[in-house]
Amino acid sequence: MITRPIILVILCYAILMIVQSFVPKAVALKRKPDVGGFMVEDQRTHKSHNYMMKRARNDVLGDKENVRPNPYYTEPFDPDTSPEELSALIVDYANMIRNDVILLDNSVETRTRKRGNIQVENQAIPDPPCTCKYKKEIEDLGENSVPRFIETRNCNKTQQPTCRPPYICKESLYSITILKRRETKSQESLEIPNELKYRWVAESHPVSVACLCTRDYQLRYNNN
């Protein structure tokens, strides 16, 4: 006759076997995938997208030629095979650029804003507050200079009535290189070809090419 202790031992053993059969399934459900580092959160939907493409274990281990030590061998990402993942990745990357602001002290500040709430200011150059008149003159540099005649545009030295303070008409100077016939061997010259340096010297000459309306900063500092 079976005693009560033996029945109790058999019952405990059966319960232990049942519990062990359900434990692997519960652990498998709770276990997170080992590719969490490749998950990118969509900031608009707060959902995670996995951008790592896995090959099936059977596809890798089934063919002897494709046997590799890593069953999760990844292939190059092809945009045509998964256009939805590619578009989501581009959106997430744009969100990261939009939200991360690099400050002057090299720190990163995260900011959020609504899409489409971007104001673009008009960056057009404003018209000058006045117009300046100029006078064309022909400057003669002498018969030993090449070129000999240069056209200049000189401003009127007096305050023009169309340009009122704090603005003033000012000449815009441009330096040109001219050739002058060498008079002495000790004359200083800019760099010129060897076939010219024995008879000619190169000099920089300023030329007034325009008359522009600009702010008179000298008048401003004198008033302060």
Curated annotation (Swiss-Prot):
Check the UniProt entry and state the signal peptide residues, or none: 1-29
Q: In which tissues is it expressed?
A: PTTH is synthesized by two dorsolateral neurosecretory cells of the Bombyx brain.
Keywords, A to Z, come to: Cleavage on pair of basic residues, Disulfide bond, Glycoprotein, Hormone, Neuropeptide, Signal
Report quaternary structure and partners.
Answer: Homodimer; disulfide-linked.
Q: Which domain of life is it from?
A: Eukaryota
Q: Name one GO biological process term.
A: neuropeptide signaling pathway
* Disulfide bonds, paired cysteine numbers: 132-169, 155-211, 163-213
InterPro entries recorded: Cystine-knot_cytokine, Insect_Hormone_Regulators
What is the name of the protein in this document? Prothoracicotropic hormone
The molecular function terms of the Gene Ontology recorded here are:
hormone activity
Protein function = PTTH is a brain secretory polypeptide of insects which stimulates the prothoracic glands to produce and release ecdysone, the steroid essential to insect development. Peptides P2K and P6K are presumed to be cleaved post-translationally and may play some unknown physiologically or developmentally important functions.
* Glycosylated residue positions: 156
Q: Does the keyword Phosphoprotein apply?
A: no
Give the organism the record lists. Bombyx mori (Silk moth)
